[in-house]
Regions:
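Amphipathic alpha-helical binding modules
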Residues: 27, 104-148
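Basic polycationic patches enriched in arginine
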Residues: 4-5, 14, 18
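Inward-facing hydrophobic residues that define packing positions of alpha-helical scaffold repeats
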Residues: 34, 41, 81, 87-88
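Short terminal alpha-helical segments
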Residues: 23-69
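Short, charge-rich amphipathic alpha-helical segments embedded
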Residues: 45-65, 90-120
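Tryptophan (W) side chains
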Residues: 9-11
Length: 148
């Protein structure tokens, strides 16, 4: 009887390991989908490969967009991811490609975060993907649901 319990315990552990591995693969796929969507939006609207919003070396040279980028990245890194996204959405300037690249870079920054960090701060890869889709729609790119 003890052998069966032991076998059952081993089987349950292996099942848990498989489930954990499946979740890891699912997260990897979702992360890859996010990168692909960001790349597609960038190619369609910014004529580049991947968004790479960068800040000037001197803070005195910051534009409004630069200040927003620094703020939202800082908030996200401090764990206020939802607050960072709200700040981004409230301060986006329509039809300004700098703000589009800023937002795309922001979502890719979130995508680079560990899934546990995202979970701990009430955020998910699905929300990142939803944010990218919404951003794309605001810029006239529709039909991304079919890709994911």
């Amino acid at each position: 009887m003890q052998i069966r319990r032991s076998e059952k315990w081993v089987w349950q552990n292996r099942t848990a390991e498989r489930e954990e591995n499946d979740l890891g693969l699912q997260d990897d796929r979702m992360s890859g989908n996010i990168q692909d969507i960001a790349r597609l939006i960038t190619r369609l609207l910014l004529k580049g490969d991947m968004p790479q919003y960068t800040l000037p070396a001197a803070e005195a040279d910051y534009t409004e967009a630069d200040q927003l980028f620094k703020k939202v990245i800082g908030l996200a890194d401090e764990g206020d991811i939802n607050g960072a996204e709200n700040e981004l959405l409230m301060n986006m300037k329509e039809d300004d490609p700098d703000y589009l690249e800023l937002a795309l870079t922001f979502y890719l920054h979130l995508n680079d975060m560990d899934v546990d960090y995202l979970d701990d701060h009430d955020y998910s890869r699905e929300e990142i993907l939803d944010g990218l889709k919404s951003l794309a729609e605001d810029w006239g790119v529709t039909g991304l649901e079919a890709l994911v």
